[in-house]
Amino acid sequence: MSGSYNFLFHLIGFGLVSAILTANITIERKLRSETDWGKKLYIGGIMKTFGMFGPFVTVILLVTGIGNIHNLYMGAPEPWYTQGWLVAKVILFAVMATNGLVTAPMLAKKRMVLIKSLSDGSASAGTESTLKKMNTQASLFLLVQVLLLLSILFLSAFGTGKHPGMF
């Protein structure tokens, strides 16, 4: 049995992304259902903790993905970018990573500021309606991330190339 540790770490990275997304979906639902503003602030802190793993997991997937491409196309007569499924996968990963590393922190920070103002009573008149819009944006963000992850998984499973070092 031959295998690549690089491929194994890539699978671990994919599992971490899946775990972070699942945890964020679960915590998002809990945040929306909670009525106490203090508990909502606490739950938001938990979400921030999970969000801190995002850059680490992105680096793991980026480095191991580059390693997998190198292993797969080392000595091949054609370059990797001639494979449409692989180019699509790289583009989807770039969109997902940018979305997760840029959009998510901005959205979470704005939402927590609104919840904090509602918690301490310094909120203006339209804050709750703004918070509802932000909650909808957060749900849409998670839906887009899940769809991107499933698209990447689909391309990995049904793409024309085989990953190096399949166990």
Annotate the PLM regions.
Residues 1-167:
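Polytopic transmembrane helical bundles with strong interfacial aromatic enrichment
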